[in-house]
Amino acid sequence: MAQSSAQLLFDESGQPFIVMREQENQKRITGVEAVKSHILAARAVANTLRTSLGPRGLDKMLVSPDGDVTITNDGATIMEKMDVQHHVAKLMVELSKSQDHEIGDGTTGVVVLAGALLEEAEKLIDRGIHPIKIADGFDLACKKALETLDSISDKFPVENRERLVETAQTSLGSKIVNRSLRQFAEIAVDAVLSVADIESKDVNFEMIKMEGKVGGRLEDTILVKGIVIDKTMSHPQMPKELKNAKVAILTCPFEPPKPKTKHKLDITSTEDFKALRDYERETFETMIRQVKESGATLAICQWGFDDEANHLLQANDLPAVRWVGGPEIELLAIATNARIVPRFSELSKEKLGTAGLVREITFGAAKDRMLSIEQCPNNKAVTIFVRGGNKMIIDEAKRALHDALCVIRNLVRDSRIVYGGGSAELAAAIQVAKEADRIDGIEQYAFRAFADALESIPMALAENSGLAPIDALSDLKAKQIETGKSSLGIDAVFAGTNDMKEQKVIETLLSKREQISLATQVVRMILKIDDVRVPDDERMGY
């Protein structure tokens, strides 16, 4: 007889009722065992990222099931590409994504900090302290750390371009582009300042387009004050350069109208076929005439058109670009002050945009070509055009630039800064440890554990730089306490000074606050889980 897979209880009248079904088909772990399992999974993920922290951090190579290779040291990208099975490890992936979505930078640091907090929490659990007490203590310690960050922060002059470039260089220092650090930092700053509204402290990232083309060197990367699209003129004999162009942006196809309903066309003679061909030709000519009469000197079409239409456009001296995607159409309309026209009959002079220069740019021996629309009336649309030896380098350069753009955007939003090299975390750790001495309850243990976890950031920076981590950290801590200078950090690039203010290693207060807050919240969530039930037939890391 098959054993029942449900848990049964009986009421006072002896009637059975089911409490939980499929008990035997579930795997269950509870209590301290569950918490420790989760801590182990989260720490495993954090340790993977630990070696990628800082300017001397190492890259990771990630190969997808399809064979696509990604080489990166961007925390969010590593986490996204990792095939994580354990559900708590997936929380760490989401943590990195949250930091990337909200701030854009600090995605590696936030995961490393969360892993260190969980490591310290495990030690406290082994000493018999309840996980909720630990979580409550971490929350209070987090509040104290954030207060310390606020007190040591400096006001940043956003109008000073040179200081902005220095901040972007800090973000780019650990990336593949660090050999062209200054150039990429200037590109990032100029791109953000081009689209930023300083008064409302707003930066519209949709106005910054990133394009890449394999070939050339990273140093060939440029910022174009306009739009670059991966298209060419539709006919090889059309002009490769237009000055003071009047641009018509069309979302209607260059073809005869088609019936909306199902239809059948009977062609029984050559005369019928000629009549059909003549009708198509007349339709094309009417459409071209309408565009020409509006005063347009360049037609940009969302849809394609056949060779006959292309020939007629060339014959009528009307340059055209076909198959331009929706996002590019919108950017072009904003940049040129054009209206997007859905029907030829609606096209008029008022709906045209203007561009001072439209030109095809060529690359390499193969003469790859792209179209550049520059000198537009609305200069709040720019394109960062990235070059590199292969697609992997270009993709990683784009990710690096994205982080730098986010850092500059955050400074426009909130101009307060702290100094890097682990100096801010160490200053916060010193103050949290001091606060622990003033607390009577069990939370004091959590405060000290939180301080130790904060020290994991400068320690990881020292490890990745080839320094003796414990010696470097103890010396640095003693100097900070002795001098009271919160800008003393790990000299990861061997510049000869520990003062990050002198080295111009700058990080945004917004990013640091978010890292500590998010890491503490996720750790609290993990510590509060004490019972896990998973289907026994699924492999989920348990």
Curated annotation (Swiss-Prot):
InterPro entries: Chap_CCT_epsi, Chaperone_TCP-1, Chaperonin_TCP-1_CS, Cpn60/GroEL/TCP-1, GroEL-like_apical_dom_sf, GROEL-like_equatorial_sf, TCP-1-like_intermed_sf, TCP-1_chaperonin. Keywords: ATP-binding, Chaperone, Cytoplasm, Nucleotide-binding. It is found in: Cytoplasm. GO terms for biological process: protein folding. SUPFAM superfamilies: GroEL apical domain-like, GroEL equatorial domain-like, GroEL-intermediate domain like. GO terms for molecular function: ATP binding; ATP hydrolysis activity; ATP-dependent protein folding chaperone; unfolded protein binding. One of its GO terms (cellular component) is chaperonin-containing T-complex. Heterooligomeric complex of about 850 to 900 kDa that forms two stacked rings, 12 to 16 nm in diameter. Belongs to the TCP-1 chaperonin family. Molecular chaperone; assists the folding of proteins upon ATP hydrolysis. Known to play a role, in vitro, in the folding of actin and tubulin. This is T-complex protein 1 subunit epsilon. It comes from Caenorhabditis elegans.
